[in-house]
Amino acid sequence: MPRYSITTFGCQMNVHDSERMHDVLRCAGYTEAGSADEADVLVLNTCSVREKAEQKLRSEVGRLARWKRERADRVLVVAGCVAQQEGERLLKQMRAIDVVVGPDNIPELPGLLGDLAIGGLPIARTVFDLDAPRFLVASPPSPSSSSSPRAAPTAFVTVMKGCDERCSFCIVPHTRGPERYRPSDEIVAEIAALVAAGTREVTLLGQTVNSYRDPLGALPRAPGASADDPDESEFAALLRRVAADVPGLARLRYTSPHPRHLTPSLVLAHAELPVLPRHVHMPVQSGSDRVLRRMIRRYTRAEYVARTRALVEAVPGLTLSTDIIVGFPGETEDDFAATLSLVREVGFKGLFGFKYSRRPHTPALKLPDDVPEGVKGERLARLFEESEALLAAHLSALVGTTQEVLVEGRDKERGHGGAGGALWSGRTGRHEIAHIDGAGELDLLGEVVEVSIARANKHSLQAELTEAARAAARPRQRGGLEPRPARRSLPVVAAEGG
């Protein structure tokens, strides 16, 4: 059996794409190698959002040249957004690459590898599936099979792909294409299958996930509402349908939304659906109206504040996190000060910060990149300092409280397990990471457990099971089934969304 290995760079969508590549390769008879050195086929699933993505790929391919030379039959595949962006140019520029495959062409990967194995030439396949969008689904273990691995507690489900927003800094519309939506019936069916296999939390994925529309018109609208009613949201209707049709689901998250589509009906869904956790990641990118206009974000600072405030008021205790770019062309010190003041005003409990980098095929490429790199770095450091202070105060305030944590797995590498041995780790409903001490002898995987917060770490919480949770927990069985991993490869660079 040919063996494969996948290395993933970039955003959560890329992680999900890699999981689907695992599925299509396994179904075609490939087996996963223990490491890249043992692989016959090595896939690099690339990200092009950040600066110098092509140079980073060239460096990685150069590093793998010896791996290729060791055996003539080894195959190097480049997938993801750099593959979509560069296409056949990659084959001409880097002769070590055998196959280039775009995100929409993942189902064709086994066939491309098969053609190559019988003497075919290196090939690039980067065609958007505009007429008949294909959405690869997860393949959970059968709930009826006692020998099947347990499903991971968390899973990702794609509801749409592509983006129509066309923010001036973003290459995603070029690498992922226009928005295409998946029928809600298919989405609900996939989530139901995951939950039946043991998954407790599902995250809905889309480049601008809350702009979702059912292509078959199967979701109900509010009485009297029209399709173009700005207060309505088919995405909110999708959330309601999942909540109603999959009652065993513990938590339903989504990423990445766009502030323009944070409608009153979506706010109301958050207020009324217990399955939606009290945390939303809502990218803002800048706190300056002048910069937001140059970014073509199509909202003002005041509109962002008003919409997120409505959400927080509707769901007491809800926390927000965000994405911010510093050093966008023309950003002044006053513009950056406006961003810092927005961070304080909204009170973000987490953020992903990035230095602006010029990307091909983006409108901002025409603007002078006039903020010096040193200034960008200094502003990013100040942004993180502000964010760290807000997070520290938030985590400290939780000490002594009781929280519900969805246990996602064992945390053996952190080295601060309690008396019960290895540590369990999970997230609260507000997305705080919690490490549970002194419960190594219990089987908590996939359970929503009540914990008492003992102390705050820099980016997480240290917790202990309450007496009631400990009494209700199952003892850990030696030799029991291990969960199937939720993520088989780790993203090495976070990418801004929304």
Swiss-Prot record:
Residues 2-118 form the MTTase N-terminal domain. PROSITE patterns: MTTASE_N, MTTASE_RADICAL, RADICAL_SAM, TRAM. [4Fe-4S] cluster 1 binds at C11, C47, C81. Residues 396-467 form the TRAM domain. InterPro entries: Elp3/MiaA/NifB-like_rSAM, Methylthiotransferase, Methylthiotransferase_CS, Methylthiotransferase_N, Methylthiotransferase_N_sf, MiaB_methiolase, rSAM, rSAM_horseshoe. Its cofactor is [4Fe-4S] cluster. SUPFAM superfamilies: Radical SAM enzymes. Residues 149-393 form the Radical SAM core domain. Keywords: 4Fe-4S, Cytoplasm, Iron, Iron-sulfur, Metal-binding, S-adenosyl-L-methionine, Transferase, tRNA processing. The keyword Iron-sulfur applies. HAMAP family: tRNA_metthiotr_MiaB. PANTHER family: CDK5 REGULATORY SUBUNIT-ASSOCIATED PROTEIN 1, MITOCHONDRIAL TRNA METHYLTHIOTRANSFERASE CDK5RAP1. Belongs to the methylthiotransferase family. MiaB subfamily. This is tRNA-2-methylthio-N(6)-dimethylallyladenosine synthase. It comes from Sorangium cellulosum (strain So ce56) (Polyangium cellulosum (strain So ce56)).
